[in-house]
Amino acid sequence: MNFRIDSLKHKNPGDTLFKILKDAPYNVLSERPYKRYQGKVIRNIIIGQVNVFNRVSDDIQQSRNSIQKLQHLLDFLHVNTQSNVIREGLFFSEKKDTVSAYLMAYNAYYLRHLPFLQTAEIYIQPLTDTKDSVDVIIITQDAFEFGASIAHSNLRLYNVNFLGGGQRIDLAVSLDKNRSPKIGTAASYVKYNIGGSFVDASIGYTTINNAAPIDTGVYETSFFVHLDRQLYKPTVRWGGGLTISYNYSMDVYSRSSGYYRNYAYRYFDVWGAWAFNVKKLLKTGFENSTRKAISLRYSILDFTRQPHQDIYRLDPNYNNRQYIIGQYNLFQQRYFKTRYVFEFGRIEDIPSGYNLALTAGVEKWINRKRIYTGAQYERSKIYTKGNFMVTGIGLGGFFKNGIEDIVFAVDNIYYSELYTLTTWRLRYQIGLNYLIGINPHFNKAINLNTERGIIGYNSELLQGYQRLTLGGEADFYAPFRFLGFRFNFFTVAQVAQLGDKGELLFGNRLYSVLGTGIRIKNESLVFRTLEIGAYFYPGAPSDMKKVGLTLKSIPNIRFRTTPIQRPEFISFE
């Protein structure tokens, strides 16, 4: 590709991307690199695309001959993202728009979070022949579009950017000789940012029980359609989503009529949000501007067939549920650029700001109508050395002849600054979580088997309505890579307590874990991060082992793109 910019002429776009990434400032607010160009006219928008496995300097030196040939072959098989797909994802246009530092920062964040790009940068090139105009260069690098996974008896194949069109195709098959039918299948299609509307749409079906069934010990077929539009930038006024599905149970293991739960249900969920003071934001600027938004959600779960067993007749999982909830948000958000939080060295955008959400609604469940109110506050604070803290607190509950299903939750995670140890990188985190349920009616007892419990716990003996977890993790990022794979060596320690809702939690027994392991990831590929871990559980309950070895894939973890999400009840789990 021939750039029309003097500083980029005759250069490999991959070298340019590498230089921009290497020189990109981090531990700074995301808008800072663009501020000196604020208000300048955008003359041209130039898109430069880099091959998936484009490597420079030290990587090329260690990746010659057969490995390089393999990378060239994979690049040949891959179809780069179409330039119009990138253009449809821009918040500005050439000739008529001017540079807004905050919109540029939000746009770079949006592009980096597209699931088919491994990285993206927006770079502003000043012009020598005029001082009031600039060229904007968008440089992107795709992730390799093909992927596969094998889990138990399931084989899954997927393409995250089919034909370079910003669309995803998933196919899966399950072969299990113990079930009937022996073969199960699943397929789905996703189109991102339809026609530049920033609406994502998906449609699909599954007969392999991977669409979040309503209960444990059941097997479901599901057909679904989903639409979603986030409030993806500060100046957008509306967002929302729609989910429709039809689901029914399958007796794949030929259970007797006394054990098989024969049911079917329809699910409909729609929500919308409206942001205020957008015009004021455009006039006064984005810095330190408090924003307001309201959102409304309607959801219904309608059973067309219920299990015939008496034990499930009044079980909340198998009864109709309908609710409508509204939310008012008061929030402020900017982004902070850093590295080595969840990823293995590429730029990450950390939200900085706060969100106050006030929620109210009405729910009807098992012919029981009740009112809900709740309040949540979240704050992300960035410190001068690049360390930051994310804090959340929430209180919510229902009213029906008194208060019931009250939930109080506190989350706090501190992320240290990034330390350099010779050529290694170190960042540690310390987290605290507290959860209590008061006057439970539908809420069931919690345990330690969740993300907010203890890593690797799998015990049904420990239950309660109050939980406290304290933990820490240190992540050591290796300076070397092998065949493009990067390595994070981690150590972790956690302690937790469970108790009943009416007792003093600190008098209960401590449960703990000590662990170490390694996480492996190739950021050019769309595969999940591979984690290998060894854990020791002193004082573990009798229904689980004291030593655990794990080999699992973990999903990519990222902070939320916007504080305005689909209104939810504060969960108790």
Q: Which stretches of residues belong to each language-model region?
A:
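Immediate N-terminus of the mature polypeptide
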Residues: M1-I403, Y414-E573
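Amphipathic hydrophobic-ligand
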Residues: V407-A409
